[in-house]
Amino acid sequence: MPVVFVAASKLPTPFATFTMHGFLDEATGREHVVLSLGDIADGQPVLGRLHSECLTGDALFSQRCDCGSQLEAALQAIAREGRGVLLYLRQEGRGIGLLNKIRAYELQDGGADTVEANERLGFAADQRDYAICLPMLEHLGVKSLRLMTNNPRKVKALTDMNIVVAERVPLHTGHNPHNRYYLATKAGKLGHMLGNEHQGEVPQA
């Protein structure tokens, strides 16, 4: 996987001053970022998150998803721990891109769920590729994670790459009336582990 390290700098945030590591995927031209805090190369499991880019949720405060809340909660958790890593992956819209995500939102406004919308546009329900994470984690010396996620695909992807997932740390945040159906679909159709409040809420055909 031709993902190469480019540069690193300090990044002060309201939560902590992180080190920001920039990486380039030479195959796609996509630029990815890792935020790290503390000694993450000591061989002990590192609190971490794989966070896929979500412009609408992360930067525009959208309540259609829980992405922005999860990003903030993950950074806060790392800051509290004093040690951790967050991989910010440029895989907008579960890998379909921003404009296609807006097209998918348009279909959702017409009644489709998040999976149906992607499929109607000719995409898989989730097109993200986590193989790009391996060279970034190797560069940083991270071999074991306490992974903040509700998504079992992320756990499997890391395990398949021989990255130890020592613990799955749930991220239950960002629930609101606007994303109730979206979260139910993620639980019912994508297998996300979101708790009993979202199980069985997906309308049956």
From Swiss-Prot:
The active site is at D126 (proton acceptor), R128 (nucleophile). The keyword Isomerase does not apply. Gene3D superfamilies: GTP cyclohydrolase II. Its cofactor is Zn(2+). Pfam families: GTP_cyclohydro2. It is an enzyme of class 3 (hydrolase). Zn(2+) binds at C54, C65, C67. It comes from the Bacteria. It catalyses: GTP + 4 H2O = 2,5-diamino-6-hydroxy-4-(5-phosphoribosylamino)-pyrimidine + formate + 2 phosphate + 3 H(+). GO terms for molecular function: GTP binding; GTP cyclohydrolase II activity; zinc ion binding. GO terms for biological process: riboflavin biosynthetic process. Its EC number is 3.5.4.25. GO terms for cellular component: cytosol. NCBIfam families: PRK00393.1, ribA. Catalyzes the conversion of GTP to 2,5-diamino-6-ribosylamino-4(3H)-pyrimidinone 5'-phosphate (DARP), formate and pyrophosphate. This is GTP cyclohydrolase-2.
